[in-house]
Structures are given as structure tokens and as C-alpha cells.
């Protein structure tokens, strides 16, 4: 049997920009992608803490060190600059893998710098 487990999480990312006319996705600072293990173009689940919106899209790389968390395209309607997001990916684990599985959790400061990495 396969179990869908949390693979990675960026906790309390702050929306830094939104571009309704961009062709979709969520731009994330490359440093945050690397710290969390989220890969470019990977499906991500996004939960807006401020308004309760929940949606899925894919991650694209933003400039390293920029703190970029930018809603693009239709996703730009799902939040406002300053809103807090929880960005999550999931992975399938077998019965043999599930007990040893540990997600990468990156806790963020309001300026999208890394506060703590929990593994």
C-alpha cells in the first residue's frame, strides 16, 4: 500500500508580489526551494492563512536571496501582498518507507528568511 505523506513545507511564507498577467504558477526564492527540497515545476499545495483559500499550482524559481513569494496568473486572485501562506508538497511512500519518512519543514520569518529548518 502507498501512503501520501508530507514531503516538504514552507511555513508562513509571506506573499511579496502578485502578477495577474504572468502565465501561472508561484515564484519562490531559489534558496527556499533548495532548503525545503521543493523542485522547480513540482506540484505544490498552497494554503492561505489569512483568507482560508486553498489551491494547487507548481513552483518556479525566483531570484536567490530575494525572499520572493509571488502569486502568478489566476493564483494572484488567491491572496494579497502580506498574506501568510503554507506551501506543501507530498510524496508517496510504501509501507516499508513510511515509518522512516521525515518531511523537510522550513519555518520562515515575515521577510521570508529562514527562521528554522526542522527535519
From Swiss-Prot:
Pathway: Cofactor biosynthesis; (R)-pantothenate biosynthesis; beta-alanine from L-aspartate: step 1/1. Heterooctamer of four alpha and four beta subunits. It catalyses: L-aspartate + H(+) = beta-alanine + CO2. It is found in: Cytoplasm. This is Aspartate 1-decarboxylase. Keywords: Autocatalytic cleavage, Cytoplasm, Decarboxylase, Lyase, Pantothenate biosynthesis, Pyruvate, Schiff base, Zymogen. The modification Pyruvic acid (Ser) is found at residue 25. Is synthesized initially as an inactive proenzyme, which is activated by self-cleavage at a specific serine bond to produce a beta-subunit with a hydroxyl group at its C-terminus and an alpha-subunit with a pyruvoyl group at its N-terminus. Its EC number is 4.1.1.11. Substrate binds at residues 57, 73-75. Catalyzes the pyruvoyl-dependent decarboxylation of aspartate to produce beta-alanine.
